[in-house]
Amino acid sequence: MSFLISLIVAIIIGWLGSLFVKGDMPGGIIGSMIAGLIGAWIGHGLLGTWGPHLAGFAIIPAVIGAAIVVFLVSLLTRKRG
């Protein structure tokens, strides 16, 4: 059950991260979940574990990390021309 909650929180974090940057996260809900998980990992590495926690995620660093991930992915996947 805690794994399912972690996935739901990761989806929400990925979605919140995508709200802060211009560009779309490809892959829909799965892409948002992956951005949330990777973003939480990056946010933890860069910013630590301060702020409120939910399901093992430090929310503020995770959302900032997810915004970074969404921004980078949107740069890499945008169509040129």
Curated annotation (Swiss-Prot):
Pfam families: Transgly_assoc (PF04226). It is found in: Cell membrane. GO terms for cellular component: plasma membrane. It comes from the Bacteria. Keywords: Cell membrane, Membrane, Transmembrane, Transmembrane helix. The chain crosses the membrane at residues 1-21, 27-47, 56-76. InterPro entries: Transgly_assoc (IPR007341). It is a multi-pass membrane protein. Belongs to the UPF0410 family. This is UPF0410 protein YwzA. The gene is ywzA.
